[in-house]
């Protein structure tokens, strides 16, 4: 998605060679117009998949996932990273380690919001090592739901996430695929 790539080049900040800071438009300050366009793109790409729910992991995936869910006219389910007083029993849980923070957390899904009849579009802001997506897929498998596709805003293609997810048999559709980045440049994989 050229609009997202352009915004990454304009406002993204590379830290080292593997962290991309996008706090000016995705995960601290959110650009609602960009999120709407992202939601439209995901909705169009997955239009023929019979999606019944969009799922994301809190918190940076919420805005684009909500826009996609709205465009598809389906509910959004948010997988929780933090314990909650309202989510305390009848849960699916799995441990996930974040690439960015290098911390583990219990990813949680309430059993009453996903069923075996659901056809899921999983949306996340980044894909690096594929750990978050793999954890989300584990939870959705526990619920016997079908993962129809995975939508990623920014994929760091020089890391193994896409390969790991593809090896599990899932389609990954990324709006911006970065093949290389450092403090001075960001190179994208151009899709045909």
Curated annotation (Swiss-Prot):
One of its GO terms (cellular component) is cytoplasm. Keywords: Cytoplasm, Glycosyltransferase, Purine salvage, Transferase. PANTHER family: HYPOXANTHINE/GUANINE PHOSPHORIBOSYLTRANSFERASE, XANTHINE PHOSPHORIBOSYLTRANSFERASE. GO terms for molecular function: xanthine phosphoribosyltransferase activity. Converts the preformed base xanthine, a product of nucleic acid breakdown, to xanthosine 5'-monophosphate (XMP), so it can be reused for RNA or DNA synthesis. InterPro entries: PRibTrfase_dom, PRTase-like, Pur/Pyrimidine_PRTase, Xanthine_PRibTrfase. Belongs to the purine/pyrimidine phosphoribosyltransferase family. Xpt subfamily. Pathway: Purine metabolism; XMP biosynthesis via salvage pathway; XMP from xanthine: step 1/1. Pfam families: Pribosyltran. Its EC number is 2.4.2.22. This is Xanthine phosphoribosyltransferase. Homodimer. 5-phospho-alpha-D-ribose 1-diphosphate binds at residues 128-132. It comes from the Bacteria. The keyword Disulfide bond does not apply. It comes from Agathobacter rectalis (strain ATCC 33656 / DSM 3377 / JCM 17463 / KCTC 5835 / VPI 0990) (Eubacterium rectale). Xanthine binds at residues 20, 27, 156. It is found in: Cytoplasm. It catalyses: XMP + diphosphate = xanthine + 5-phospho-alpha-D-ribose 1-diphosphate. CDD domains: PRTases_typeI (cd06223). One of its GO terms (biological process) is purine ribonucleoside salvage.
